[in-house]
Amino acid sequence: MAMTAEVKDELSRLVVNSVSARRAEVASLLRFAGGLHIVSGRVVVEAEVDLGIIARRLRKDIYDLYGYNAVVHMLSASGIRKGTRYVVRVAKDGEALARQTGLLDLRGRPVRGLPAQVVGGSVADAEAAWRGAFLAHGSLTEPGRSSALEVSCPGPEAALALVGAARRLGVSAKAREVRGSDRVVVRDGEAIGALLTRMGAQDTRLTWEERRMRREVRATANRLANFDDANLRRSARAAVAAAARVERALEILGDTVPDHLASAGKLRVEHRQASLEELGRLADPPMTKDAVAGRIRRLLSMADRKAKQDGIPDTESAVTPDLLEDA
C-alpha cells in the first residue's frame, strides 16, 4: 500500500472520543474535500474522497454529531478520473449542516478559510483539522530527497488556516501556489513524523521513519564509497604524475644527479602506484615517507632549474592530460 493510502487508512480507523475534535474533523474534511452547491434553491453539502472507509467515517460522524443522513455515491474510474471516488452528500438538511459545521457564517455566506470554532479551538481541534484536511486531499511521498507531506487546499484562506493549525502543533508548514492550486507543504523529515503522530497515524509514522532511516543509511554508504573511490583516483593520478615528472627529471639531469636523489627517483618510477610510505619501506636502507618525499622534491627542483637554464621543457611537461586519463 502506498504511503498516502496507509496514512488515510489508519486515520479512518482512529477512534476519537472528543466531540469537539470530531466536529473539527468533519468541518475540515467537508471544507477541503467538497463544497456547497445550490440545487433547486436548496443548499447541498458534498464531499468527494478517494477511499470508501473515509466516506463511511464521514457519513457516520455526520449522523452521530448532527443527526443528518448522508448518502454515499461511488464514482467508478473513467477518463481523467484515475481511481474510484466516493461522494458523500447531504441534500435535505444541507443548509442546517453547513451552518452547524461553520461552512456558512451567521449571515449565510460561505466561509473561505476554516470555521472560527476550529481556528480558535483546542490543540486537539487543530490536530483534528489536519486529520480532516489530510483525509480530504492529503498526500505523503516516500522518504527521500523530495519527501513531503502535502495537502491541496480549496483556496489561499484555507491554506493559511491550515498553516496556522500546524504552527499550534509545533510544526512548520508552508503555503504555496503550484500551477494555480493552493497547497500546504511540510518537507522536514522530523516535522512530517511529528505531524503524522499528531494526526493519529503513529503506526504509519514508524513505517515511514524506518524507510527514511534505511534510505539515509544507504545514501551515507554510497557517499562514503564514492568518497573513497574519488580519493583513490586522486591518489593514483598524483602518483602517476609524480612518476612522470621524476622520469623527466632523471632525463634532464643525466649523470649529474646525486646518487641519493637518483635512488629515490628510481623507486618512484619503478613503483608508480605505491604510496610514499611503501616507497620508504622498499628503499635500502628503509626511509620514512617524509625523507622519500623530501628527496623527490629536491630532485624535481634541481631538474626544473637546469631545464630553465638550458631552455628545455621542465618536469611539468611530462604530465599530460592523456597520462592522467589513463591513470
From Swiss-Prot:
It comes from the Bacteria. The keyword Chaperone does not apply. Belongs to the WhiA family. This is Probable cell division protein WhiA. The gene is whiA. Involved in cell division and chromosome segregation. The keyword Nucleotide-binding does not apply. HAMAP family: HTH_type_WhiA (MF_01420). Residues 304-327 are annotated as: Disordered. Keywords: Cell cycle, Cell division, DNA-binding. GO terms for biological process: cell division; regulation of sporulation. The lineage of its organism: Bacteria, Bacillati, Actinomycetota, Actinomycetes, Mycobacteriales. Residues 275-308 bind DNA. It comes from Mycobacterium sp. (strain KMS). One of its GO terms (molecular function) is DNA binding. It holds the Pfam family LAGLIDADG_WhiA.
